[in-house]
């Protein structure tokens, strides 16, 4: 399925489970060896979009260009430490809590402010923007309101650019919208949607 999507022009793929990400990367590496073609699908960009435990970093960080789901200071610090040890700067999105579903993960707006203010520096992390998941409901008014909260946090981040904190002018990504609600997300300012179920089917 990934090869079909690639042939259709898709280059950015995302995975929510560390083991499956590592397995897919290794499968593609084996395919290149089998074909004798190191360039085969070598321009794929992998994003990680699931809950990431600190003990699974080595299964994810070597392979991804963006971690969309950084939802705690502990994880942020662990990624920064891994980057320092491996001489690599990691691109991340700060996952924000925007829904009325208390089981969802993420930072509050105040916590995001603390991170970007620069009181603690993250030298091996590049904050590329924010990510959020709306309330799982058929009520479009609620979903739209959730997405607007994330857009407001993104707008707040723009005010910090140039203030010497942990962000720069590239901090503009807003990852919101999934297979069931992406049209609303796009209307509310999303720059990145997560629509794997719509393309590849449910797991």
Regions found by a protein language model. Name each.
Residues 1-180, 188, 200-202:
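Conserved alpha/beta-domain cores
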Residues 191-192:
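Divalent-metal-activated hydrolytic enzyme cores
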